[in-house]
Regions:
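Negatively charged, low-complexity tracts enriched in Asp/Glu with abundant Ser/Thr
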Residues: 1-26
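Generic, low-specificity signal for short hydrophobic/alpha-helical stretches with a mild N-terminal bias
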Residues: 4, 8, 20, 60, ...
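Hydrophobic alpha-helical segments, principally membrane-spanning helices and signal/leader peptides
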Residues: 24, 59-61, 103
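Short acidic/polar alpha-helix capping motifs at helix-coil junctions
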Residues: 28-32, 74
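Short aromatic-glycine-(Arg/Gly/Cys) micro-motifs in beta-strand/loop hairpins
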Residues: 31-67
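Short, compact, well-ordered microdomains
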Residues: 63-106
Length: 107
């Protein structure tokens, strides 16, 4: 089973040119130790998780990874992508419910 990606992804500036290669590497288990993925959280009461792409080397994490909504080159950049998502959710819905905003945009 492959990874689930949200389109369009939230990503760092300059990653647009590399995103197809990044996706291919992650889909085929090549991994990348310098990437962080922002995913929909599976934990009750939480909205998003930030996961190191290196963790995808573990089968259990790879199989259970929820939808990927963002890609970043560092943990700090991943936090910036979450802030971007929050700003978009607030502008579109007036509430800070990022998860609901992203799920509704996906449909």
């Amino acid at each position: 089973m492959g990874l689930t990606w949200r389109d369009p992804l939230y990503m760092d500036a300059g990653m647009e040119k590399k995103i197809n290669r990044i996706r291919w590497r992650l889909e085929h288990g090549a991994g990348s130790f310098r990437l962080y993925l922002v995913t929909i959280s599976t934990s009750p009461g939480m909205q998003l998780d930030i996961v190191s792409a290196a963790d995808l080397k573990q089968r259990v994490i790879r199989r259970r990874l929820p939808m990927i909504v963002g890609v970043a080159g560092s943990y700090e950049d991943a936090l910036d992508r979450v802030q971007d998502m929050l700003a978009d959710a607030l502008a579109a819905t007036g509430t800070p419910d990022i998860r609901k905003y992203l799920e509704n945009r996906q449909e």
